[in-house]
Amino acid sequence: MVMMIIIYTEPEISLFPLQDRSEELSSNVENGSCNSNEGINPETSSHWIENVVKVRKPYTVTKQREKWSEEEHDRFLEAIKLYGRGWRQIQEHIGTKTAVQIRSHAQKFFSKMAQEADSRSEGSVKAIVIPPPRPKRKPAHPYPRKSPVPYTQSPPPNLSAMEKGTKSPTSVLSSFGSEDQNNYTTSKQPFKDDSDIGSTPISSITLFGKIVLVAEESHKPSSYNDDDLKQMTCQENHYSGMLVDTNLSLGVWETFCTGSNAFGSVTEASENLEKSAEPISSSWKRLSSLEKQGSCNPVNASGFRPYKRCLSEREVTSSLTLVASDEKKSQRARIC
C-alpha cells in the first residue's frame, strides 16, 4: 500500500509587487516571450498601479493667521482714536490681542485705508484719522564727552595778545603749576608785589614750547640775599682763575698767530653787555696795547711771556669778569 503525502503550501504574499513584477518581466524577456497578453491580467495590473502610487503626508499648518472679529476691530478703532500709536495701551483696551498682533493689524489697516482713500466718498464712511508716527527717542548719552574743565585762574590779557601774535596754543596749566615746573629756570630770589610787576614792561620768551613772561627791570634790583651774592662771587672768581690758567698754559700769542681769538669768552661777554660800555672800552684798550707789543714771529711765539705781561692780562680778565657779573645782576629777569 502506497501512501501519498500531499503538502499544501500557501502562496506567499509579496510586500513588494513592483519588484516581483520586474523580475517576471525580465525572465520573460530572457525566454523570448515578448507577447503583452501572456501573464498579464487586467485585475492584477490595476492592483499593481494602485500600490505604485505613494501617499503624500498631510500638510500641517504650523502658523495660523489670527482672525480679528468685528468686536475686536471696533475696539481697535476706538483705541486708535484714544491712544494713537500707543500699542501697550491699545493692548490693555482690547484685552485679547498682543501688542505685536495689534501693530501688524494696524499696519495692514492703514495701508488698506490709503489705497481706498481715492475711491471712497466722504459721506459714505466716517473718515478715520491715521495717527502720525511717534518721534524716535534720542539717546541721553550717545557717546562719551569730556566735561569742560573749569579754569581756576584766567590768563592775563598780555599773554592772550602775545599768543595770538605767535599763533601758539594756550596753556591749560595754572600759573602756580607752571612756576613749580619751571623752577630750574628761575633763580632763588624774593619776588616783589604784583604792583611792581604791572609797572615794569613785560616780554615773552618761548621756552620748550611754552610762553614765559619775563619782567624787564630798568633799575638794579635792590633786594638780594647775602648768601646768593656770596655764591655768585665765589663762582665768578673760580671761573676767572680757570680762564687765566688756560690762557697761561696754552699761550695766547700762539693763538693770535693762527688767527683764533683766545679771548672769545671775553668778547662774547662784552657783546651781550650794552650798558657798561665805558669800563669794557678801557679794558679793551689795554688789551690792544698788549697785542701791539707782541709780534707773530716764531721767536716770540715760542717760550714763556714776561711776568709783568701776565700780571696785566690777569688784571684785564678779572676786571672784565667783574663787569660781566655786575651786568648779570642788573639784568636778572623775573620769570613768572
Swiss-Prot record:
Cellular localization per UniProt: Nucleus
Organism domain of life: Eukaryota
Gene3D superfamilies, alphabetized: Homeodomain-like
InterPro entries: Homeodomain-like_sf (IPR009057), Myb_dom (IPR017930), Myb_dom_plants (IPR006447), SANT/Myb (IPR001005), SANT_dom (IPR017884)
Gene Ontology cellular component terms for the protein in this record: nucleus
DNA-binding region extent: 87-110
Ranges annotated as biased composition (Pro residues): 145-158
Protein name per its UniProtKB record: Protein REVEILLE 7-like
